[in-house]
A protein has these predicted regions:
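Active-site phosphate-binding strand-loop segment of PLP-dependent enzymes
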Residues: 11-78
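PLP-dependent enzyme catalytic core of the Aspartate aminotransferase-like
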Residues: 21-25, 206-215, 221-252
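Conserved glycine-rich beta-strand-loop-beta hairpin in the small C-terminal domain of fold type I
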Residues: 141, 145, 161-169, 179-192, ...
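Active-site C-terminal subdomain of aminotransferase-like
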Residues: 90, 120-139
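Structural signature of PLP-dependent enzymes
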Residues: 125-132, 148-170, 196-199
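Active-site PLP attachment segment
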Residues: 88-124
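Substrate-binding/gating loop at the entrance of the active-site cleft, primarily
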Residues: 1-6
Length: 252
């Protein structure tokens, strides 16, 4: 849109931390916006308070807008706290925060979410949004508005998914995969460098065809298809499915 050209900052394993100096070095007079995603898909990384302060500093110094993708905001583990762009006063003034009812309430097929921003930004947002989204299901909007009144419907999500993550990681103990536990989302990265020399796409295809386990090769998320020999698995499954998958993966 408007002939914008994205500049990507490659997050690197095992922890996928943001190199803020690299971000600063890539900002030019043409830069208009920084886009972030936390909790991060596919890595499960979280932006810390220090990360958000670094972002706020860069955005203020360079007069940049921020698009903060926070669709996994309620799926965070190990006592960590979600650092929303809306929590930082100077950052909130220049940020669009997007979130997803689909991710929060297990109904991704409904394609329902929201964007929050200061009024002056939302007026500009709406000029574009009206040509991108034709309509949404109004009865479902009403239902979700009612459902949101009970905070227990989303405040308990972290515990629910952490049990899934911990269950899966416990079953994966002793495997040949290198694993850094996910800090958020319902995804877990698995490093297969000790198992295969194949690229991640070939390895994922082999897992699907030979072992009936569907994963995502993480190079498809990267600019230039950078291959770190990692796959992404989803642990938002029944315990029986996770146990069966872990048994197969442990034997590789």
């Amino acid at each position: 849109m408007h002939n914008f050209v994205p500049t990507s900052i490659q997050l690197k394993p095992p922890f996928y931390a943001v190199d803020w100096q690299e971000v600063a070095d890539n900002i030019s007079s043409k830069t208009k916006m920084i886009i972030i995603n936390s909790p991060h898909n596919p890595s499960g990384m979280l932006f810390s308070k220090d990360d958000m302060l670094e972002l706020q500093d860069l955005a203020e110094k360079n007069d940049l807008l921020v698009l903060s993708d926070e669709v996994y905001e309620h799926i965070i583990f190990d006592g960590n706290v979600h650092q929303s762009a809306s929590k930082f006063e100077a950052l909130a003034e220049r940020s669009f925060v997007t979130a997803s009812f689909g991710k929060t309430f297990h109904n991704t097929g409904w394609k329902m979410g929201y964007c929050a921003a200061p009024e002056k930004l939302m007026k500009e947002f709406q000029k574009v949004h009206q040509f991108v989204v034709f309509c949404v299901n109004h009865p479902i909007q009403k239902a979700l508005a009612t459902y949101l009144k009970d905070k227990n419907h989303y405040w308990k999500l972290s515990d629910f998914y952490q049990q899934k993550r911990d269950f899966f990681l416990h079953l994966m103990e002793g495997s040949n995969f290198k694993i850094v536990p996910s800090k958020g989302t319902y995804f877990q990265m698995l490093d297969f460098t000790e198992i295969s020399n194949e690229n991640d796409i070939a390895f994922a295809e082999w897992l699907t065809k030979e072992h009936k386990i569907a994963t995502i090769p993480t190079s498809v998320f990267n600019e230039g298809r950078k291959d770190f020999k990692q796959i992404r698995v989803c642990f938002a499954k029944t315990d029986e499915t996770l146990a069966e998958a872990a048994k197969i993966l442990r034997e590789l």
